[in-house]
């Protein structure tokens, strides 16, 4: 009787509060029903009523929390209990380890073995076999939900394993058909092939580096030649002739018999040295011999290279033999193709330096000394493959 009176008074108090504040949610009916249903549960009626009064007088958030903690029976209690059991079961599945003790790595190995043994297969075929192999039997007391969950887990892992193997190019997939390609292997022949490829690439890099350096030297030589010619013309010592670029220089012994045939269109030249050793040089070689490529071109406000070094290129008379001094001088036979007899000063030319008062005779002027080189023709601005 005391418990009932407490609940009725409390319900009456709640109804008055609800009339005064319509926006407040009423829990009188629900609490009344709960107090009656819980009168036969564990604990004394007085303690249960005190717990109910505490729930109602708290705030809304506390009310939800404490109502969920009540031991509720009946239809509502059954539905909430089933929901709680379901959530608990899901939590155990997510947190607990795999009953089969198989991870993605083990499944990947199994999938790899299956596909390798079959050669050609499908996803469903591999998944069905692994489900039959790893799924728990029905006589161990496993629920159908657990078996369905395990089957889905196995199929998902098979799908992930196939994607990994496909990314590694171990298997290939054409629509639904999966084909085995093979595991990657590295043999001694592969290592040797990689070494040879590396050596070939290094050689190509070295050749391109040497070619780039040669082009830079040729550019420096041409710039210095242009500055030297401009200085000569501006000083009023313009020479009467020169050698136009590009050209080829033929070098052989002084007493050798050389037969030269030139086509009418001046595009083809045939040399017959009669088994005499010879060397072919291009204009870049001559620029290097004249020291044009040693120094970078000077700025317009700086000193000209021709003021520092006297570049003199005088082809030796083929009728004269080599000098008998300690350092032998090479005789040069020159052949070049010119379309005009008189060249303008803007065109690249190798112009001999005019004689000054300090030079008494042309015999005192030493010819160009060139090192002994093999018989190779180096064309200017040759393309690099």
Curated annotation (Swiss-Prot):
The keyword Protease does not apply. Keywords: Cell cycle, Coiled coil, Cytoplasm, DNA-binding, Nucleus, Phosphoprotein, Repressor, Transcription, Transcription regulation. Residues 22-31, 300-327, 355-364 have a biased composition (Polar residues). GO terms for molecular function: DNA binding; protein heterodimerization activity. Ubiquitous. Residues 101-184 bind DNA. GO terms for biological process: DNA endoreduplication; G1/S transition of mitotic cell cycle; regulation of cell cycle; regulation of DNA-templated transcription. Residues 185-234 form a coiled coil. Residues 32-53, 336-349 have a biased composition (Low complexity). Phosphorylated. It is found in: Nucleus; Cytoplasm. Gene3D superfamilies: Transcription factor DP (1.20.140.80), Winged helix-like DNA-binding domain superfamily/Winged helix DNA-binding domain (1.10.10.10). GO terms for cellular component: cytoplasm; DRM complex; nucleus. The keyword Transcription applies. InterPro entries: E2F-DP_heterodim, E2F_WHTH_DNA-bd_dom, TF_DP_C_sf, Transc_factor_DP_C, Transcrpt_fac_DP, WH-like_DNA-bd_sf, WH_DNA-bd_sf. Residues 1-53, 71-102, 296-385 are annotated as: Disordered. SMART domains: DP (SM01138), E2F_TDP (SM01372). A motif (DEF box) lies at residues 150-184. Belongs to the E2F/DP family. Involved in the regulation of the G1/S transition. Increases the DNA binding activity of E2F proteins after heterodimerization. The complex DPB/E2FC restricts cell division and lateral root initiation and may function as a negative regulator of E2F-regulated genes. The interaction with SKP2A is controlled by auxin. PANTHER family: TRANSCRIPTION FACTOR DP. The DIM domain (182-263) is required for heterodimerization. Heterodimer with non-phosphorylated E2FC. No interaction with phosphorylated E2FC. Interacts preferentially with E2FC, but also with E2FA and E2FB. Interacts with SKP2A. Targeted for proteasomal degradation by the SCF(SKP2A) E3 ubiquitin ligase complex. This is Transcription factor-like protein DPB. It comes from Arabidopsis thaliana (Mouse-ear cress).
């Amino acid at each position: 009787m005391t418990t009932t009176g407490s609940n009725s008074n409390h319900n009456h108090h709640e109804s008055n509060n609800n009339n005064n504040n319509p926006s407040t949610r009423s829990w009188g009916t629900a609490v009344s029903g709960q107090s009656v249903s819980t009168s036969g549960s564990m604990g004394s009626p007085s303690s249960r009523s005190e717990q109910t009064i505490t729930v109602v007088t708290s705030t809304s958030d506390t009310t939800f929390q404490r109502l969920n903690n009540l031991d509720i029976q009946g239809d509502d209690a059954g539905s909430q209990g089933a929901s709680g059991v379901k959530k608990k079961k899901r939590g155990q599945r997510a947190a607990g380890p795999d009953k089969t003790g198989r991870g993605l790595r083990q499944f990947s190995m199994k999938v790899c073995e299956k596909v390798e043994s079959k050669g050609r297969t499908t996803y469903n075929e591999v998944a069905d076999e692994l489900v039959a192999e790893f799924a728990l039997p029905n006589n161990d007391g496993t629920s159908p939900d657990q078996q369905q969950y395990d089957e889905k887990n196995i199929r998902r892992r098979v799908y992930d394993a196939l994607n990994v193997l496909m990314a590694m190019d171990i298997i290939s997939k054409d629509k639904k058909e999966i084909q085995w390609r093979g595991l990657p292997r590295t043999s001694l022949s592969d290592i040797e092939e990689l070494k040879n490829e590396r050596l070939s690439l290094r050689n190509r890099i070295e050749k391109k580096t040497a070619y780039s350096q040669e082009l830079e030297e040729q550019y420096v030589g041409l710039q210095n030649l242009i500055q030297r010619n401009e200085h000569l013309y501006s000083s009023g010592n313009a020479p009467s002739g020169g050698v136009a670029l590009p050209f080829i220089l033929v070098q052989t012994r002084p007493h050798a018999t050389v037969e030269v045939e030139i086509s009418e269109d001046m595009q083809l030249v045939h040399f017959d040295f009669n088994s005499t050793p010879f060397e072919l040089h291009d204009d870049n070689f001559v620029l290097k011999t004249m020291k044009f490529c040693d120094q970078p071109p000077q700025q317009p406000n700086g000193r000209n290279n021709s003021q520092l070094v006297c570049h003199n290129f005088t082809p030796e008379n083929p009728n004269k033999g080599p000098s008998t001094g300690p350092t032998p001088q090479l005789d040069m036979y020159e052949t070049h193709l010119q379309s005009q007899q008189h060249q303008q000063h803007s065109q690249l030319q190798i112009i001999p330096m005019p004689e000054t008062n300090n030079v008494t005779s042309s015999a005192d002027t030493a010819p160009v000394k060139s090192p002994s080189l093999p018989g190779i023709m180096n064309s200017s601005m040759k393309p690099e493959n």
